[in-house]
UniProtKB/Swiss-Prot annotation:
It is an enzyme of class 2 (transferase). InterPro entries: Ac-CoA_C-AcTrfase_FadI, Thiolase, Thiolase-like, Thiolase_acyl_enz_int_AS, Thiolase_AS, Thiolase_C, Thiolase_CS, Thiolase_N. GO terms for biological process: fatty acid beta-oxidation. Pathway: Lipid metabolism; fatty acid beta-oxidation. This is 3-ketoacyl-CoA thiolase. Keywords: Acyltransferase, Cytoplasm, Fatty acid metabolism, Lipid degradation, Lipid metabolism, Transferase. It comes from Shigella flexneri serotype 5b (strain 8401). GO terms for cellular component: cytosol. Its EC number is 2.3.1.16. Heterotetramer of two alpha chains (FadJ) and two beta chains (FadI). The lineage of its organism: Bacteria, Pseudomonadati, Pseudomonadota, Gammaproteobacteria, Enterobacterales. It catalyses: an acyl-CoA + acetyl-CoA = a 3-oxoacyl-CoA + CoA. PANTHER family: ACETYL-COA ACETYLTRANSFERASE, CYTOSOLIC (PTHR18919:SF107), ACETYL-COA C-ACYLTRANSFERASE (PTHR18919).
Length: 436
């Protein structure tokens, strides 16, 4: 057993999460079509502050993330401060850790709280898959820079004459890993084959995710943590996530063709999370600051861990690697958890991580640990559904998971919850939460 690392300030204060909120999540090019991530971020932070009734000047720092960067607003955090009526002196900076971006934002605010430089801050993330930075070819970009330096019209025309029609075609954002050229779906296929995960198992998990998410909405469990979004042309508000298939059957999933390995694959659009637009944020404070303001925290951040592995194989095993570290730092075991919430990038990736968390061989030979992290109890796992159903606005997912888990822990009378995710680049994140 490694060292327990209590997340407390010098005065012994725990890190309290006092409030959390998100927009409804919308599939790419649907309800939030044309709404940039920065506007989604402003929307959720503005509403979060209004609902919490916390004076804006109490917030001393805002750390926010965006994975699909927009060149015109590179520091989304600062734009949110300036666009929501927050105190202009509020420190604000942006982070990016792929699909674990808002985990990183929460960790950064927590570290500021523990260092004593602030007493309250906001962490979160927003992404739009509908408003994308469409680029130009490398040759056109090179010519445009040279044209800007040219002094005469003849020099400019000569430069433009080097271009061909294909050089003028727009270039969409890459969906593959920069370092390997592999898509995340390719890695999900590799993991399905390596760990013997069948198409039927993947479809069953996806179906479970949609059923549970639909039930969560039907039972009213998400109303407190999801705002109503009013979007141009303001004819109809978006109230709920629009990706959830509440009436689907397992037979529906079986009809889809593989999306990555067309001949022999098992990963489909239905057993993967879709491209999504949305934003989410949480307010963190020292425990004493929350008491001063008369606030009852949703819960507390008990521990966190980030890991990184090679990107050529098993790139999406972040949960299997970061979870034992987070549990160790929290001084807990898997059996002591009340809830486990794992990001469902793909059903194949999710099932592989579940398998390896319970594997003694993986623990010994890969992690160098004496025993497996622990079997995942299905009754504790993704009890309200997961990212396959809700969708995945990259930078917002972590904050969604944290808020959702804390609310569910409180409904169950308290306890400990694990939230964990894989991320592009072979990254992994895990956090242990506590509610009373």
């Amino acid at each position: 057993m490694g060292q327990v690392l209590p997340l407390v300030t010098r005065q012994g204060d725990r890190i309290a999460i006092v409030s959390g909120l998100r927009t409804p999540f919308a599939r790419q090019a649907t309800a939030f079509h044309g709404i940039p991530a920065v506007d989604l971020g402003k929307m959720v932070v503005g509403e979060l502050l209004a609902r919490s009734e916390i004076p804006a000047e109490v917030i001393e720092q805002l750390v926010f993330g965006q994975v699909v960067q927009m060149p015109e607003a590179p520091n989304i955090a600062r734009e949110i401060v300036l666009g929501t009526g927050m105190n202009v002196h509020t420190d604000a900076y942006s982070v990016s850790r792929a699909c674990a971006t808002s985990f990183q934002a929460v960790a950064n605010v927590a570290e500021s709280l523990m260092a004593g430089t602030i007493r309250a801050g906001i962490a979160g993330g927003a992404d739009s898959s509908s408003v994308l930075p469409i680029g130009v070819s490398k040759k056109l970009a090179h010519v445009l820079v040279d044209v800007n330096k040219a002094r005469t019209m003849s020099q400019r025309l000569k430069l433009f004459s080097r271009l061909r029609l294909r050089d003028l075609m727009p270039v969409p954002p890459a969906v593959a890993e920069y370092s390997t050229g592999l898509r995340m779906g390719d890695t999900a296929e590799q993991m399905a084959k390596t760990y013997g995960i069948t198409r039927e198992q993947q479809d069953a998990l996806a179906h479970r995710s949609h059923q549970r998410a639909a039930q969560a909405w039907s039972d009213g469990k998400l109303k407190e943590e999801v705002m109503t979004a009013f979007i141009p042309p303001y004819k109809q508000p978006l109230v709920e996530d629009n990706n959830i298939r509440g009436n689907s059957s397992l037979a529906d999933y079986a009809k889809l063709r593989p999306a990555f390995d067309r001949k022999h694959g098992t990963v489909t659009a239905a057993n993967s999370t879709p491209l999504t637009d949305g934003a989410a944020a949480v307010i963190l404070m020292t425990e004493s600051r929350a008491k001063e303001l008369g606030l009852v925290p949703l819960g507390y951040l008990r521990s966190y861990a980030f890991t990184a592995i090679d990107v050529w194989q098993d790139m999406l095993l972040g949960p299997a690697r970061s979870t034992p570290l987070a549990l160790e730092r929290a001084g807990l075991t898997m059996s002591e958890l009340t809830l486990i919430d794992m990001h469902e990038a793909f059903a194949a990736q999710t099932l592989a991580n579940i398998q390896l968390l319970g594997s003694e061989r993986f623990a010994r030979e890969v992690l160098g640990r004496a025993h497996a992290t622990g079997e995942v109890d299905d009754s504790k796992f993704n009890v309200l559904g997961g990212s396959i159903a809700y969708g995945h606005p990259f930078a917002a997912t972590g904050a969604r998971m944290i808020t959702q888990t804390l609310h569910e822990l409180r409904r169950r009378g308290g306890g400990f919850g694990l939230v964990t995710a894989c991320a592009a680049g072979g990254l992994g994140a895990a956090m242990v939460l506590e509610a009373e």
